[in-house]
Amino acid sequence: MTSNRMQTGHPADGVYFGLMSGTSMDGVDGIAVRFEAGKPPAVLSEAFVGFADTLRDALFALQQPGDDEIEREALAANALAARYAVCCHELLRTAGLSPDDVRALGVHGQTVRHRPERGYTRQLNNAALLAELTRIDVIADFRSRDVAAGGQGAPLVPAFHATVFGSPDETRVVCNLGGISNITILPAGGGPQGEGHARNDTVRGHDCGPANALIDAWVERHLKQPFDDGGRFAARGKVDETLLAALLDEPYFRQNAPKSTGRDLFNADWLDAKLAGFQHLAPENVQATLTALTAATVADEIARHAGDCRAVYVCGGGARNPVLLDALATALAARGLDAAVATTAALGVPPQQVESLAFAWLAYRFNARAPGNVSTVTGAAGERVLGALYPR
């Protein structure tokens, strides 16, 4: 096989892998994609590799301070790298590629701490081991440079969203419903820029609040299921408006952008504290209310920052929850917004591919020595090349 590395029109063109393991911590999504200047990304294959319960438990435990953290973190990072490598080998197999055909692998890692106000963010991974196991250049640690430049380090996907989802005719919002919800606002006048030169001066975005982090935690506690399949648990319940008001009484929701958040704030302890005095509620009513919380906080931010938007395109795990999507549409209408809600599949990108595609694209940007952040989104002092290289 002739190496793809010799068949490029731009020095950074070629095949890239992207790996993303989100706050659900259920596994890693991987994608193989070809980037060529002036052309849209071409997906070659995708894969999902789940995490064993032991690894998932270790990752959840590292969300909170505890004993012997350095040892536990190192062992969990090694286990993560091993699962990431399995995903990469599956991508190689299904795409018919060899490691020499891949320019680089962009890997997010697993966030275990995100505290930009203290000047750091920590995405767990052993990138050196991953490079050894795959024999592919690994580009990792994308968030730290933005934080070092005074930014939030999140969200990092808006520049990619602008590249593939922008429109010359309408203002669009891309909403990621992962563990945490975030929005990217793409004003009319943009448009897909195949080589990735997003109009960063007009793009805005930030984290809104909790999404699947709390929804999944509650359904796992009561049904021993990893997520609310189809939103059925929430559909059995009724929103409790008093509890919803208590949940919304959180300073983060009143904070101005740029802002970012994570499980450091929105976790089971936060929820349990808010539920004090609501022990009489049936679990399905709490689930319905958590779903309404996600819809309300996203709709509030869209109404505040993108009142002229006509379409909201959803990606992330929440895109597979029709009850949540209906709640979002209802919440937008209640705030006077005439905005249709659809998934990014309507724009040609399946919602489960968006995040892993974004980190493959960030690896592409690193190789091009081009900025990957949007400083107006993160609050960084300027645009920066993101990531660190671990050669094969």
UniProtKB/Swiss-Prot annotation:
GO BP annotations, alphabetical order: 1,6-anhydro-N-acetyl-beta-muramic acid catabolic process; amino sugar metabolic process; peptidoglycan turnover
Sequence positions that bind ATP: 22-29
Catalytic activity annotation: 1,6-anhydro-N-acetyl-beta-muramate + ATP + H2O = N-acetyl-D-muramate 6-phosphate + ADP + H(+)
GO MF term (any one): phosphotransferase activity, alcohol group as acceptor
Enzyme class (EC, first level): transferase
EC number, UniProt record: 2.7.1.170
Pfam family, one: AnmK
Keywords assigned: ATP-binding, Carbohydrate metabolism, Kinase, Nucleotide-binding, Transferase
Recorded metabolic or biological pathway in which this protein acts: Amino-sugar metabolism; 1,6-anhydro-N-acetylmuramate degradation; Cell wall biogenesis; peptidoglycan recycling
Entries under NCBIfam families matching the protein: PRK09585.1-3, PRK09585.1-4
Known function: Catalyzes the specific phosphorylation of 1,6-anhydro-N-acetylmuramic acid (anhMurNAc) with the simultaneous cleavage of the 1,6-anhydro ring, generating MurNAc-6-P. Is required for the utilization of anhMurNAc either imported from the medium or derived from its own cell wall murein, and thus plays a role in cell wall recycling.
Family listed: Belongs to the anhydro-N-acetylmuramic acid kinase family.
HAMAP family, per the entry: AnhMurNAc_kinase
Name this polypeptide is given: Anhydro-N-acetylmuramic acid kinase
Lineage per the UniProt record: Bacteria, Pseudomonadati, Pseudomonadota, Betaproteobacteria, Burkholderiales
